[in-house]
Amino acid sequence: MKISRIAVASLGLFATTAFAQSSVTLYGVADAGIEYLSNVPSASPGGSNQVRMTSGNMSTSRWGLRGVEDLGGGLKAIFELESGISFDTGAQNNSTRLFDRSAFVGLGSKYGQLTLGRQTTPMYDTTLQLDPMGFAPRYSLFKMDDVLAGRADNAIKYRGIFSGLTVTGLYSFSRTGGGEVPGNYKVDRNMGVSLMYETGALAVGAVYDEIQGSTVATADRKDRRALIGASYAFGPAKAFIGYRWYNGNVGALPTNGSNIYWAGLRYGLTPALTLTGA
């Protein structure tokens, strides 16, 4: 059997002898704390209390590399590699992926940014901005949505900013890496699009996300999500409000739809201390 391949596009960064302006940045976030829990399930009636050290409370602990290469004419090549780590143990967050949070390469210009690889979805990007808790790993309401596609493998993503309006679109050939099945392009597919408008203190966003089943048997089934929300900053405070709709049936049995309504407030007591309620 002869297998034919057509390369539609290829993006990459290569070492050259050209004297183009370039940079590579090593960055990271360290988040560790002490947590007290009550009524933890145990052998004791009514549960027990627990004190423990935790990593990734308000933000996932991580490290990464981010690079930019000036190609001239307003065009630049970019890449990002990011890995989650646990500061309480030093272990990787994902034992099978070194760069579990992102691994992409792309091109950018005044018309926007086009990237290929593992990257965040429009649903994640929009929720991160409109969630009062900032998608905090341990405390955000949205962490209860186990199927929310925060990141997608094998993804093409476009992001452009035009006079305060950010437009983002993503298409993943296989969100979890289990798709790309010959003869069935629907398996594990993920699509999403979002609009975010920011002007002064006001931000308004909307996003739609769709996931196909991850097996051939469930490829025609879909998880659908839509979200709309807004935030407004006044003085040291910032208010949030929003709504998320969900309907899905990618599993063996259809699941019930769900709705989430939220409101919240952040208040900066000092430059280093912020109170959040939601």
Where are these regions (language model features)?
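Gram-negative bacterial Sec-dependent N-terminal signal peptides
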Residues: 1-21
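Short alpha-helical scaffold segments that flank and stabilize functional sites
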Residues: 12-13, 23, 31, 209, ...
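Glycine/serine-rich loop-strand microenvironments at binding/catalytic pocket rims
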Residues: 18-55, 258-262, 271-278
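Outer membrane beta-barrel
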Residues: 22-36, 50-174, 187, 196-200
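Gram-negative outer-membrane beta-barrel proteins
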Residues: 34-42, 85-91, 122-126, 175-179, ...
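Residues that act as N-cap/strand-start positions at coil-to-secondary-structure junctions
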Residues: 45-47, 99, 152, 189, ...
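Active-site cleft segment of glycoside hydrolase catalytic domains centered on the general acid/base Glu
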Residues: 182
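Detector for outer-membrane/organellar transmembrane beta-barrel domains
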Residues: 185-278
